[in-house]
Amino acid sequence: FIDIFNLSNNHIMDQGPDGLSRSIENIERLEKKYFGAGQSLAESRKPVIVDINGYKVALFSYCCYSSNSESYAKLSSPGPAPLVYEYIKQDVDEYRDSVDFIIVLPHWGIEHENQPTYDQVILARRLIDIGVDAIIGTHTHTIQSFESYKGKSIYYSIGNFLMNDFQLTASDRYYWSSLNKETMLLEMSIFDGDLKFNEIFLKFNKDMLPEVVSVDSLITNIKKINTTLIYKTANLKHENYEPNLDLSLKFNGKSMQVINNSQLVSSNLTARALSIKAKL
């Protein structure tokens, strides 16, 4: 059923380096492929290259720094690949001429929201500018808006699909909102050199299993959130802004938390300019 595993997420190191190693060992034992994490920074950034209708497609994944930010891959230590523009550009430049398509799958965004931040939009469009052919985001537990930029698809977050070993308690039923129970799959196809995606929408049923539904049956108003994204970013000069996410650390009384300082697209732009000259 699953041939390739994306390991780049903010929980892959919850059981430490041994947990990551065991995960990789089990994937390899099943003769499957993985990407997005590894025993070093270089290994975590290696793509999986798949063949689709005779076209070579490179899959890269990177994870935004979050509450467990010390667990990310470093030069010689294991973890998921960190979501850093300079790393992604280096990787795209290395593989651009040897594959037909490059897809980046970032694990990012503010949880339980239907819009990305301005920083995410800037980073996504900068990645398309340097040769990425599609972006498919995860992490927020919700469906977020999506767009086509320069004819390339950008899905900021596709929501939840399966929650392994989910304990369906009364509190779970209460706290897991209707928006968290909606998701979508992307069916990818390549014909005549064109990379296309077909959205398949799903909802979790009472047993927390996904069922295919029509877009009109979703509580998430896809048309509205996509229209808001287009309207709010219509005049965004993304090339004038810093491409990396604006993050900071904050102690919440128990632990250090990573805060995304950029505003959601549904609010006003507060992205960081590259320089005064660029801003002008």
Range-by-range predicted roles:
Residues 14, 64-86, 110-113, 162-178:
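Acidic/histidine-rich helix-loop elements
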Residues 8-30, 113-120, 146-150:
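Metal-dependent catalytic neighborhoods of phosphoester/phosphodiester hydrolases
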Residues 8-10, 92-115:
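Short acidic, glycine-rich surface-loop motifs adjacent to enzyme active sites
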Residues 51-102, 122:
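Binuclear metal-dependent hydrolase catalytic cores centered on His/Asp/Glu-rich metal-binding motifs
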Residues 10-12, 39-40, 63-65, 107-111, ...:
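Catalytic metal-binding/acid-base residues of hydrolase active sites
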Residues 172-280:
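A short C-terminal boundary segment appended to hydrolase-like catalytic domains
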Residues 2-4, 118-184:
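Conserved beta-sheet core of the metallophosphoesterase superfamily
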Residues 3-8, 33-36, 57-61, 101-105, ...:
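Structural recognition of the beta-strand scaffold that forms the well-ordered cores
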